[in-house]
């Protein structure tokens, strides 16, 4: 799933006098096993395999359910409302693609990184994972930017062309994400032997340069460029909402800070670890025990980064009252009539005490929701929004 292969890329770890005697990858891996064994550190590989399997399984089950629900609910809505929903829908598709690749990684872990699925799947599974990983990050970035633009831009030109612009951006993201992994995937090969392994094997003489180039490009495109954009535009959106002083502005501001924090937690450890291991001995020198420690936990950190597939549906969908209402409506459709009537009654009762703003068309003024009060309550006056896009700009 990265430029750090499971067997550890050691062309830069071997001593110079031994390295001159190495002529192919098999000899290099054999030398590495001898060199690495000289660094003693008590780390239980069996425990790590169990932890990885459980972690992968939990992410797979929870992420699969969440993203399928997000896609189902938003597909029903996207034909009628577009708005920022398009980015959320595409991000869920990308996250689902990552989730669907997890069973292969789980089996690979349990087989101690023996690859049993042939040369084609070795490249394709890695390509499929990387393309969806970049897509998810890019759609998250586009969503952060577009949310701020939607909150601040009321020009007629934007109102007329925003649907077309969003569709073009989404298409461009998929194309870009399909191209970016190619330099890495081209050098992913199946190393034959009694226990074949799927590894990043760039040309032997220039392996260090290739590994560094791929690692730097992954960090730049996957973190250093998206993170400032996500942080800046979410902070700007939060400041904009706070100035408006709406009832829900505090909750929305906290959500936007949560978007930033979750992105950092998921991706910063992964990129720092990958860069340290790639730069080791060629540009920096790390102690033997630290290298051993980083290699041991790299796969756990890599797996931990996939938590964004679980966090994204929660942050951008399930915390939204409108999404939960649409999800309940979708569930009610498939319930038996009596249960559906009871669920519908509960949904109606809970929603009658909430005030909401409905956007009938993009760019139109908000209308007051029709309220039918119960004997114990009265209708509250509508909230006045300074922008007609607040409801649609906050998932």
From Swiss-Prot:
UniProt keywords, alphabetically: Cell membrane, Disulfide bond, G-protein coupled receptor, Glycoprotein, Membrane, Phosphoprotein, Receptor, Transducer, Transmembrane, Transmembrane helix
Sugar attachment sites: 24, 33
Transmembrane segments: 54-75, 87-109, 124-145, 167-189, 214-235, 255-276, 296-316
GO BP annotation list: response to hypoxia
SUPFAM superfamilies associated with the record: Family A G protein-coupled receptor-like
Tissue: Expressed in a wide variety of peripheral tissues in the adult rat with prominent expression in lung, testis, adrenal and liver.
Cellular component per GO, a single term: plasma membrane
Spans within the Cytoplasmic topological domain: 76-86, 146-166, 236-254, 317-395
GO molecular function: adrenomedullin receptor activity
Protein's membrane topology: Multi-pass membrane protein
Disulfide bonds: 122-198
Modified residues (Phosphoserine): 329
Subcellular localization: Cell membrane
Residue intervals on the Extracellular side: 1-53, 110-123, 190-213, 277-295
PROSITE patterns assigned to the protein according to its UniProt record, in alphabetical order: G_PROTEIN_RECEP_F1_1, G_PROTEIN_RECEP_F1_2
Signal sequence region: none
Family: Belongs to the G-protein coupled receptor 1 family.
Function: Orphan receptor.
Protein name: G-protein coupled receptor 182
Gene of this entry: Gpr182
């Amino acid at each position: 799933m990265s430029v750090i292969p499971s067997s550890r890329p050691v062309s830069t770890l071997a001593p110079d006098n031994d390295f001159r005697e190495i002529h192919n990858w098999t000899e290099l891996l054999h030398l590495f096993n001898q060199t690495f064994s000289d660094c003693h550190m008590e780390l239980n590989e069996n425990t790590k395999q169990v932890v990885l399997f459980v972690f992968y399984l939990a992410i797979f089950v929870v992420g699969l359910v969440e993203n399928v629900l997000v896609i189902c609910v938003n597909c029903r809505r996207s034909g009628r409302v577009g708005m920022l929903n398009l980015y959320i829908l595409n991000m869920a598709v990308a996250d689902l693609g990552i989730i669907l690749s997890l069973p292969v990684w789980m089996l690979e872990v349990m087989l101690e990184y023996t690859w049993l699925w042939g040369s084609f799947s070795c490249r394709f599974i890695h390509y499929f994972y990387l393309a969806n990983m970049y897509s998810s990050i890019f759609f998250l970035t586009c969503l952060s930017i577009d949310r701020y633009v939607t909150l601040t831009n009321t020009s007629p030109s934007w109102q007329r062309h925003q649907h077309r612009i969003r569709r073009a951006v989404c298409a461009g993201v998929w194309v870009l994400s399909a191209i970016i992994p190619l330099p890495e995937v081209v050098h992913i090969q199946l190393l034959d032997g009694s226990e074949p392994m799927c590894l990043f094997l760039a040309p032997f003489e220039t392996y260090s340069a290739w590994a560094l180039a791929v690692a730097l490009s992954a960090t730049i495109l996957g973190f250093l460029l998206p993170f400032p954009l996500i942080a800046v535009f979410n902070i700007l959106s939060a400041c904009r909402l706070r100035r408006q002083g709406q009832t829900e502005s505090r909750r929305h501001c906290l959500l936007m800070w949560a978007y930033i924090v979750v992105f950092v937690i998921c991706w910063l450890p992964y990129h720092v670890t990958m860069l340290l291991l790639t730069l080791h001995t060629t540009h920096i020198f790390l102690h033997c025990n630290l290298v051993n420690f980083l290699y041991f936990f790299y796969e756990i950190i890599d797996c931990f980064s996939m938590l964004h597939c679980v966090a994204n549906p929660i942050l951008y969908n399930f915390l939204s009252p409108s999404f939960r209402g649409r999800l309940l409506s979708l569930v009610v459709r498939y319930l038996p009539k009596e249960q559906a009537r009871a669920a519908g009654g509960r949904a109606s009762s809970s929603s009658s005490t909430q005030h909401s703003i409905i956007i009938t068309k993009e760019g139109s003024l908000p209308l007051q929701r029709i309220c039918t009060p119960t004997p114990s309550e009265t209708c509250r006056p509508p909230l006045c929004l300074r922008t007609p896009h607040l409801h649609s700009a906050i998932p």
